[in-house]
Amino acid sequence: MIESIEKYKKLLNEATNNNGDWKSPYENLMRELYKLPVIFFALSRDNYDETNKKSTPLISTKDFNGTPALYVFSDVDLASKWMIGYRHTTDDLKYGLIGAINKEPHDFLYVFQMARALGAQKIMLDEGGDWVGIDINYFMEVNSISTKQVSMLLTAEQAKEVIADNKPPTVRFFPISLIPLK
């Protein structure tokens, strides 16, 4: 699957450079990204829980002229190189501030829905390699991800509290375990 991601990134780059049809490879790239069995996310240094080695997905404004973006990687090796290159690691250098979310059993669609609800407008895909900026609304449209609701993973206890309080839960990312650096 990662080969198809690279293929569509290359086709998109060629189309963009030659003023060709960029829409088809762009949409196919978005579909292939969403088909991956696991996606890697840069995690926030600000929300890092040192005791549990967890953090939440990073939304950064360092690229796209300050536009908030969710940092996503299709490959763990590329993500690890990015973490080391930017020193986006724990202080002891044992972990990169990177986490993996499997498509199954919970599906990672909630991360994209949550990121959009929290203000992300872009997806920075594979920074540090042949990166691509993806419009998050377009990504959700192409992959039939609802923009009208947000899927949230709640524990049974959290669900009981929401029902008892009769108000919606706070929209927030859930902590993701860090991956040890190789």
Locations of regions flagged by a protein language model:
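An interfacial alpha-helical scaffold signature
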Residues: 1-182
